[in-house]
């Protein structure tokens, strides 16, 4: 009976080499200008075609009047020598000119421009990446398909709608990934919009074809059968649906016979009371991460909250900050996470972004087994590295970090600038190397990453928080601020509570830059204590 499963097999075209637009909102803005240029070129082409048609129309109207007069008295008309001459001239010369005008291709300029710009277009991987980002945002922020389709997202300035065809394409992307849960959600949304009367290039038969199979793959045979019957009402000759109908009915009959004795056990399971909600502390990391991204589950006792303060910080009497101390705020106690306010100016931010933009490349991670740098699905951003010697602003920023932390930046890594893409994120990770990764920073020769300094260089309309799932902390982006924490205890042991993540950007454009400071050079700046965990 396996031959009955004819149900859908779709392959996306192979992706070509591309710049990975979907991983950086900053670079995606270039596409807006590209499309604007193409629209201008297209309008020029339309104007040229309209001018051409106007000339042909005027010529046709003139000849229509002339031939109407001539056909009333052909002999009398050509008996006039001027008319005879003009008739010869028109047929010998002017009709040839008209033929050339009609055959003239006005699209050359537009096609030429389109061909030039096409090399900068996103490709299949970009489109699929953007689609997956929507699915990721849907899960992380508990958004239903109707909310996304209608563009009702928090903080949006430019509301945008999804057509039934768009919803269908999202469902197809999920299907290609064998993600039948999202396939069902988006095919149902497409079907809903079609049922509401939306005019579309897709039809209900195609949607039901995918939907019935997605439901079947999730084990809901009754619903799959119902949807298949609905499809056959619209297209009784649909070969795959007819095959599936027989297969579903066969499976249901077989299950009914085999599982009769087990039906009582199943009913007992259904009546079993549900377990009480699990405390946030004991949820799997993925759930805690998503809850924190939504601003849920963040709890700190009043006693702990009383230990959090705001203060002016002069960098241990650093001359640069005595008259204008830095504004410091405690974000969390264990691990201690500090935010510095108004610590980088808008002008400095723009210079850093301008330096980074031409160098932005897809962000990578170090493979713990091979040590090779590679792109991964859980880190969606582009990054660039800036050295202090190449621009005085970068050098000044580096020294500011040293003055405020008291740590030596000469052994730190270069300033990393990152711009997050559609649904841009970096799932939970450690900044420091664990004991099973002894060679992680061996080539640097500066030891482990003792601390992290993170600048927020843009406000984010929705999403994009930095969260610490182990402890329940969430730090929200605020332009011009920076956060700082130690990854290692003073003993050099890793602080596993610093495991953190960059939440997906729901709406907006997130720019950050960070400085990873290393152990070497800090021996007397942050000496170890007698305890491993201090």
From Swiss-Prot:
Transmembrane segments: none annotated. Changing residue 247 to A: Strongly reduced affinity for peptide substrate. Its cofactor is Fe(2+); L-ascorbate. The keyword Mitochondrion does not apply. GO terms for biological process: collagen fibril organization. Keywords: Dioxygenase, Endoplasmic reticulum, Glycoprotein, Iron, Metal-binding, Oxidoreductase, Signal, TPR repeat, Vitamin C. One of its GO terms (cellular component) is procollagen-proline 4-dioxygenase complex. Binds 1 Fe(2+) ion per subunit. Expressed in the heart, liver, skeletal muscle, kidney, placenta, lung and pancreas. 2-oxoglutarate binds at residue 510. Residues 1-17 form the signal peptide. Fe cation binds at residues 429, 431, 500. Belongs to the P4HA family. Heterotetramer of two alpha-1 chains and two beta chains (P4HB)(the beta chain is the multi-functional PDI), where P4HB plays the role of a structural subunit; this tetramer catalyzes the formation of 4-hydroxyproline in collagen. This is Prolyl 4-hydroxylase subunit alpha-1. It comes from Homo sapiens (Human).
């Amino acid at each position: 009976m396996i031959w009955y499963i004819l149900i859908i097999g779709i392959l996306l075209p192979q992706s070509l080499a591309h710049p990975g637009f979907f991983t950086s909102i900053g670079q995606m803005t270039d596409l807006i200008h590209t499309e604007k240029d193409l629209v201008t070129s297209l309008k020029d082409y339309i104007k040229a075609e309209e001018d051409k048609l106007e000339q042909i129309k005027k010529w046709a109207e003139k000849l229509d009047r002339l031939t109407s007069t001539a056909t009333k008295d052909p002999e009398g008309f050509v008996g006039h020598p001027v008319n005879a001459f003009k008739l010869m001239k028109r047929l010998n010369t002017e009709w040839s000119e008209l033929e050339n005008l009609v055959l003239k291709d006005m699209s050359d300029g537009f096609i030429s421009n389109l061909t030039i710009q096409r090399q900068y277009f996103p490709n299949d991987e970009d489109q699929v990446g953007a689609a997956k980002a929507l699915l990721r945002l849907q899960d992380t922020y508990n958004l239903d398909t109707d909310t996304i389709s209608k563009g009702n997202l928090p903080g949006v300035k430019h509301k945008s709608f999804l057509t039934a065809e768009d919803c269908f394409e999202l469902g197809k992307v999920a299907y290609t990934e064998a993600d039948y849960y999202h396939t069902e959600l988006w095919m149902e949304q497409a079907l809903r919009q079609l049922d509401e009367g939306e005019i579309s290039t897709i039809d209900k038969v195609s949607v039901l074809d995918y939907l019935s199979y997605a439901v079947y793959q999730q084990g809901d045979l009754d619903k799959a059968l119902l949807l298949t019957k609905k499809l056959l009402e619209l297209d009784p000759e649909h070969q795959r649906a007819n095959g599936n109908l027989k297969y579903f009915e066969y499976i249901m009959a077989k299950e009914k016979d085999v599982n009769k004795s087990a039906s009582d056990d199943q009913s007992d399971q259904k009546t079993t009371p549900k377990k009480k909600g699990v405390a946030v502390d004991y949820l799997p990391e993925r759930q805690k991460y998503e809850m924190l991204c939504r601003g849920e589950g963040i709890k700190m006792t009043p006693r702990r909250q009383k230990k959090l303060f705001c203060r002016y910080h002069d960098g241990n009497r650093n001359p640069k900050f005595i008259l204008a101390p830095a504004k410091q705020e405690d974000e969390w106690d264990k691990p201690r996470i500090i935010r510095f306010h108004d610590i980088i100016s808008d002008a400095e931010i723009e210079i850093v972004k301008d330096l980074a933009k031409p160098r932005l490349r897809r962000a990578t991670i170090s493979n713990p087994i091979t040590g090779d740098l590679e792109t991964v699905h859980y880190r969606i951003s582009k990054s660039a590295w800036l050295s202090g010697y190449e621009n005085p602003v970068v050098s000044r920023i580096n020294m500011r970090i040293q003055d405020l932390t008291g740590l030596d930046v000469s052994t730190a890594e270069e300033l990393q600038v990152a711009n997050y893409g559609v649904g841009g994120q970096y799932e939970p990770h450690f900044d420091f190397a664990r004991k099973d990764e002894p060679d992680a920073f061996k080539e640097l020769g500066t030891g482990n990453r003792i601390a992290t300094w993170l600048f927020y260089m843009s406000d984010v309309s929705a999403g994009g928080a930095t969260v610490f799932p182990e402890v329940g902390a969430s730090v929200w982006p605020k332009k011009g601020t920076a956060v700082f924490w130690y990854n290692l205890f003073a003993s050099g042991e890793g602080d596993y509570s610093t495991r953190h993540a960059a939440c997906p950007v729901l709406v907006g454009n997130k720019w950050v830059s960070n400085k990873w400071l290393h152990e070497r050079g800090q021996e007397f700046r942050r000496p170890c204590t007698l305890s491993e965990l201090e």
